[in-house]
Amino acid sequence: MARIAGVDIPKNKRGVIALTYIFGVGRSRAIEVLEKAQVSQDKKVQDWNDDEIGGIREAVSFYKIEGELRSEVSLNIKRLMDIGCYRGIRHRSGLPLRGQRTKNNSRTRKGKRKTVANKKKATK
């Protein structure tokens, strides 16, 4: 099992798929990395030799990935909340950011339903 950028890459998968296990590396970036390292996309991770792994590590090191990328994303969200813009307010209140309706859906962002007791109707 190869270890790249602090992530254990599954050895039984093809290189392109295996590299997507790294946070910040998708399909297209995985293809770029393999081209820079001159490794075949169809080659499985278990068939990589030490030189190829070293080349891949070097190619991946030019990108922001894993912890560095996670911290940048969280700092961006924190900045939005600090300046008090609309997206920051929505982040702070745990609601959808991109204009979705919230009357019926958005259970993922709002969490489990909170029941509200009905007022008893006044009798005539």
UniProtKB/Swiss-Prot annotation:
Please name the PROSITE patterns in this protein's record: RIBOSOMAL_S13_1, RIBOSOMAL_S13_2
User: Under the GO molecular function aspect, what terms does this record hold?
Assistant: rRNA binding; structural constituent of ribosome; tRNA binding
User: InterPro entries of this UniProt entry?
Assistant: Rbsml_uS13_C, Ribosomal_uS13, Ribosomal_uS13-like_H2TH, Ribosomal_uS13_bac-type, Ribosomal_uS13_CS
Pfam families, per the entry? Ribosomal_S13
- List where Basic residues composition bias occurs: 100-124
Q: Where is this region: Disordered?
A: 94-124
GO terms for biological process, alphabetical? translation
> Keyword set for this entry?
Ribonucleoprotein, Ribosomal protein, RNA-binding, rRNA-binding, tRNA-binding
What cellular component terms from Gene Ontology apply here? cytosol; small ribosomal subunit
Quaternary context: Part of the 30S ribosomal subunit. Forms a loose heterodimer with protein S19. Forms two bridges to the 50S subunit in the 70S ribosome.
Family membership: Belongs to the universal ribosomal protein uS13 family.
Cross-referenced NCBIfam families: uS13_bact
Q: What does this protein do?
A: Located at the top of the head of the 30S subunit, it contacts several helices of the 16S rRNA. In the 70S ribosome it contacts the 23S rRNA (bridge B1a) and protein L5 of the 50S subunit (bridge B1b), connecting the 2 subunits; these bridges are implicated in subunit movement. Contacts the tRNAs in the A and P-sites.
Please give the name of this protein: Small ribosomal subunit protein uS13
